[in-house]
A protein has these predicted regions:
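Short acidic, gly/pro-rich beta-turn/loop elements at beta-sheet edges
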Residues: 18, 34, 58-60
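Short, mixed-charge low-complexity intrinsically disordered segments
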Residues: 40-72
Length: 72
């Protein structure tokens, strides 16, 4: 079975923004939930989310005036 890459986001307190805290590979969503909770348990997270990396899509235009340029 092919593993799926999931990005992991969490927030420490209600109302705070979600923060990307890492990523993991798992065979399915249920195992990804278990892996995320046990891998990133060093904090007392209020909320943690997983997102399959294949479901993250760029919003900004790739042909815009600053495409391909870093900050600064």
């Amino acid at each position: 079975m092919e593993e799926i890459v999931f990005d992991v986001f969490a927030r420490k307190n209600r109302g705070e923004p979600l923060t990307h805290i890492g990523y993991l590979s798992a065979p399915d969503r249920e195992m990804a939930r278990v892996y995320a909770w046990t891998t990133y348990d060093e904090e007392n997270w209020f909320e943690m989310c997983i997102v399959p990396r294949s479901e993250i899509h760029l919003v900004n235009r790739t042909d815009g005036p600053f495409a391909g340029r870093g900050a600064g």
